[in-house]
Amino acid sequence: MDRPPAPPRARAKRTKNGNTDGKDGPCCSTEPMNVDEFVGHLRETLASSGQIVHVETMEAKPAVRATLSESVSLSDATIAAFKGGIGLDLKSRLFSHQASAIESILGETTPRKHVIVSSGTASGKSVCYNVPVVDTLLADPNATALYMFPTKALAQDQLRALRIILANVPKSEETVFGIGIYDGDVRSKEARAEVRSSDRLIITNPDMLHVSILPSHKQWVRFLSGLRYVIIDEAHAYSGVFGSHVALIVRRLRRLCSELYGSSPQFIISSATVANPLDHARDLIGFHGVRPDEDTIETVTNDGAPRGVKTFLLWNPALKPGQSHQTNTERKFRRVTPVVEISQILAECVQHNLRCLAFCKTRKLCELVLVYTREILRSSAPHLADKVASYRGGYEAGERRVIEKELFSGVLLGVATTNALELGIDVGSLDVTLHLGFPGSVASLWQQAGRAGRREGRALSVYVGFDGPLDQHFMRQPRALFDAPHEFSYVWAQNPTIVAQHMLCAAFERPLFANPGVDEVYFGSTAREVASQMVAKGRLTVDPGSFVAWNPAAKIAQPLLACTDKSPALDVSVRTIEEEHFDVVDVSTSREKIIASVEASKAFFEVYEGAVYTHQGRTLLCTKLDLERRRAHVRMADVKYFTRVKHETTCSVPGGMRVYGETDTSLPMSQCVKCDEVNISTVFTGFSRVARGSQAKFDHVSFPPRSTEFHTVGAWLRIPDDIVSKASETVDLRAGVHAASHAVLNALPLRVPCGENDVGCECFSADLHAERGRRYKPLRFLIYDRH
């Protein structure tokens, strides 16, 4: 196979060092450039065919400083720690939002205030919670704090920052406290016991809080009894079904602290800019301000951080020669692949000493961009080929730490990444962000773009569009993107299914009251009904002889409900993160090495026999998928193609392949809508080999069918037969229904508290339908819960 094709270029000219500038083949110059020079260079080289369809310039914003009021008195040790650790003068150099947040947290108010800080990327939100936490824990030897981050990388990043700060506490201080991480990477019993017994600031994630800390709370008596602060960072990540689970986990934590350990932690929440910060905070932690004695939540949105000038380019890949009038069915092949284009831009960034992140929507795209970029650099600047890497989920923890460190230090100049680096990990000063397709929300796009130009530095962001309708809409209507408001973050803590799951977990941790009272404060007005259902199913048991307690709300003695399950938390996946996974084992040499892991549900998509698996730019071929040992064997292979599995997903109601009875077709439209259990089955039948550069399929391999399935709930709308018969004469109704289903999926988060990955729809394949005409497929909209 040939290397990825480059777009046509004009005649080259020589630069000062004698290298060509890229107009007649790959740019071989390695002269450093600033952002403005680089944009001009792109216009003359890679974008010479008019790929830059819009330029948006965002003006700089100066810093707004503020000082703390006299009501807040920080200790000398705290002031010295931040001054020596990160060079921050807490007396005079705080941004306005930092000062507002610290005053709200440490100020003497009744009722006490929880705080939500919503500001832009790299605005110094961590100072808002680190200052009060450090000051309080230095002053009180019994006080503890819990930091909760959505990713392990963020936890490691915050650990490094806190250790630098605490290393600068004056030697005379006797109350310097221990900091520890408690997550899945801390595997030994000894290490976990050390964190529990001695550390006073513990960094974790919602998953570990759910499956380990709360169920084993009796091992955490010291920590929970002294809990003063709970930090929820990157709260905008807690949305949809995942956010609803996190909201119930937080309520379980509050319940144990209040009812068993006599503590009442103050919540400090930080978030990127969202449309509804106060409502989101209320939904997450459960304080809605409706009771006179209830804590209130203070919103801090006066972002005082500076921002440098940012140039934002919309980049539409060039049309292939003669492709401007292609029909719709061929349109996905009419442009140069955006994967190649973004790889060329990334290579140029590295060559001209601009530090860059290239955001990709999937792991496979991330690896492909790295492969293409290295191939380009080996041709144009071979000594820089190792200056790029990829970063995504599935890598071993040690490998992730090395990449983070090398990006921060400048050893790496470019990284192709999934949204794993979207959140606020400190990777140093970046110049450029690249975005391969729309990431799913305006908020995510700005969060990613905000990684470049931290503080006053000038920055560039380039959004490279696919040929799909959404990307092309933004390419043609840029104001629809740049004038769009930030989306709302949704959490539905009253989701009855999720409430039931977490009430079982809560009953395991501490038996529930059988009647309304204390526990309704945490689980809402549906708690009584949910508890009754769990009793009827035998999941909760009433034992008045053994469990009788005083209910202070009802002022009577009441029986308690105990959980009959041994480990209910293990049965609740808070974000479909699977405990089961396949190890990817490199068997290229006699010393086998685990290089990554793949979730069990994705194994048939990624590591089937014959699959091309890429890891840090290395191409490997999967030679064996061991289902019993859950291992995928891969070995090095020099191939110029990637593979795409062939599969079909079908939706059916358990008990029969047909969802509808014969009488359904005569019902009015309003009666054709149903909601019930749905079975989702995926059958894998083979794979295609796809050429890297052209993206053309050139071979197909079949293998014995394999299948996976899961049960969930769905809603569907049957299209009446009379409409089908009339419309089918003039239009492809099945394709229209398929398109409409995806349109509904995209619009659903605007009306329902869910994320874009929380729901799926029934998809139709014209080819498969023709091949498998023996199987009845009713024409319908069908949407199902992915969880």
Regions flagged by a language model, labelled:
Residues H236-D303:
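Post-DEXD/H (motif II) to motif III coupling segment of the RecA-like Helicase ATP-binding lobe
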Residues T144-Y147, T151-Q158, L346-I376:
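Conserved strand-helix element at the start of the C-terminal RecA-like helicase core
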Residues V134-D157, T175, S258-S263:
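Conserved SF1/SF2 helicase motif Ia
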Residues M1-S100, P111-H114, F177:
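Helicase-associated low-complexity/disordered flanking segments
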Residues V274, L278-T362, L504:
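Conserved interdomain linker/interface between the two RecA-like ATPase lobes of SF2 helicase motors
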